[in-house]
């Protein structure tokens, strides 16, 4: 159990930054990723997190709205069970691809502006920016291939 707690904490910090999630939401997300795929009940999540019902509820709702988790019910049981969305990797790749596209757009705007306005000293960084733009394009193509794979095998 201690190993799971350590992983939830360590990965939670990473997911806070990566997905821009509140600390508790990031840790709930990690807990669900590290748990049985049949899902965890609200009470199981609350017990592990040792947080208030309202905090757990608010953060679970945030994860549900972001399509990072799903809920299910079990026959004869009135409880909701939460588990990671089967699309969680797709969502991550889509978000990353969006950021890469935006960065490519910004780099291209910088190069265009500096070229059109003959910015003094720009020639020194032009080659590096062009190489960086190529790199961004290559990474985008890899993300697109991965997304295609996940869409076909989801």
What are these regions, as identified by a protein language model?
Residues 1-27, 153:
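Short alpha-helical segments that sit at the start of domains
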Residues 115-154:
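C-terminal regulatory/oligomerization modules of transcriptional regulators
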């Amino acid at each position: 159990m201690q190993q799971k707690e350590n992983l939830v904490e360590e990965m939670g910090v990473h997911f806070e930054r990566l997905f821009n999630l509140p600390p508790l939401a990031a840790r709930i997300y990690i807990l669900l990723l590290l748990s049985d795929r049949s899902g965890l009940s609200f009470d199981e999540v609350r017990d592990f997190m040792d947080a208030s019902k309202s905090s757990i509820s608010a953060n679970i709702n945030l994860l549900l709205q972001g399509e990072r988790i799903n809920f299910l019910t079990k026959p004869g049981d009135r409880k909701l069970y939460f588990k990671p969305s089967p699309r969680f990797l797709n969502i991550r790749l889509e978000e990353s691809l969006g950021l890469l596209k935006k960065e490519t757009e910004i780099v291209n705007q910088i190069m265009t502006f500096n070229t059109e306005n003959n910015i003094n000293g720009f020639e020194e960084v032009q080659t590096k920016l062009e190489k960086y733009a190529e790199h961004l394009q290559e990474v985008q193509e890899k993300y697109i291939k991965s997304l295609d794979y996940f869409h076909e095998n989801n």
